[in-house]
């Protein structure tokens, strides 16, 4: 029976789990990316996503609810300032989990959890991929072949 299995208890009592998720959520908002285990990242995603949805409307009530989750006024300021502006048009899915491998000591699955709109590497690659065309690749490869052929013939003429 699946009784009391709605969320991962993470091997902790309720107060410890709430404090840990609150601290991890504040760190995620302040640093935009944190390194943790996959189980904690999945629990954090369930904890943070509704919180990020609440920040779309900046009211005193939503700020108080968010503060009850975070207990960190610096994270709250960052959340309602910079983060809320970036996620305003996104309908959900504010976090991304990138699995990195296994921890050396206990072989626990490790990962990065990050805010989607703050990964400059992935955003930059998407922009670069959109600008490339197939025709430009053919031209570059043709230019390289044309330049390489005369360079090989010149040393042979010098040897004779």
UniProtKB/Swiss-Prot annotation:
It comes from the Bacteria. The keyword Ribonucleoprotein applies. The keyword Ribonucleoprotein applies. Residues 129-140 have a biased composition (Basic residues). Residues 128-160 are annotated as: Disordered. Part of the 50S ribosomal subunit. Contacts protein L32. PANTHER family: LARGE RIBOSOMAL SUBUNIT PROTEIN BL17M, RIBOSOMAL PROTEIN L17. This is Large ribosomal subunit protein bL17.
């Amino acid at each position: 029976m699946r009784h009391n299995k709605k969320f991962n208890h993470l091997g902790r009592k309720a107060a410890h789990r709430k404090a840990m998720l609150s601290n991890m959520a504040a760190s995620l908002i302040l640093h935009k990316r944190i390194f943790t285990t996959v189980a904690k990242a999945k629990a954090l995603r369930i904890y943070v996503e509704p919180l990020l949805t609440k920040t779309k409307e900046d009211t005193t009530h939503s700020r108080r609810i968010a503060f009850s989750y975070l207990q960190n006024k610096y994270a709250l300021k960052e959340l309602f300032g910079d983060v809320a502006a970036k996620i305003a048009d996104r309908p959900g899915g504010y976090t991304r989990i990138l699995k990195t491998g296994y921890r050396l000591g206990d072989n626990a699955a490790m990962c990065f959890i990050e805010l989607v709109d703050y990964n400059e590497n992935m955003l930059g690659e998407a922009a670069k991929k959109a600008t490339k065309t197939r025709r430009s690749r053919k031209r570059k490869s043709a230019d390289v072949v044309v330049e390489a052929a005369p360079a090989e013939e010149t040393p042979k003429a010098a040897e004779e």
